[in-house]
From Swiss-Prot:
Protein name: Non-structural protein 3a
GO biological process per UniProt: symbiont-mediated suppression of host innate immune response
InterPro entries, alphabetized: IBV_3A
Species of origin: Avian infectious bronchitis virus (strain Beaudette)
Function (record text): Involved in resistance to IFN.
Native organism taxonomy: Viruses, Riboviria, Orthornavirae, Pisuviricota, Pisoniviricetes
Signal peptide: 1-23
The keyword Signal is assigned to this record: yes
Keyword Signal: yes
C-alpha cells in the first residue's frame, strides 16, 4: 500500500519538472525574440542618427 502513493508522487514530481522545463524553454525563446526586436530597434535608431550626422556634414 505504501509503495503505490510514493510511485504516484514520483510520477507527479517528474511531470511537474517536465512542465516547468517546457515553460522555461518557452520563456527563453520569447526572451530571445524580444532581445532581437530590441536590437533591431536600436540598430535602426543608430543608422538614422548616423545618416543625420552625415547629412549635417
Amino acid at each position: 500500500m505504501i509503495q503505490s502513493p510514493t510511485s504516484f508522487l514520483i510520477v507527479l514530481i517528474l511531470l511537474w519538472c517536465k512542465l516547468v522545463l517546457s515553460c522555461f524553454r518557452e520563456f527563453i525563446i520569447a526572451l530571445q525574440q524580444l532581445i532581437q526586436v530590441l536590437l533591431q530597434i536600436i540598430n535602426s535608431n543608430l543608422q538614422s542618427r548616423l545618416t543625420l550626422w552625415h547629412s549635417l556634414d
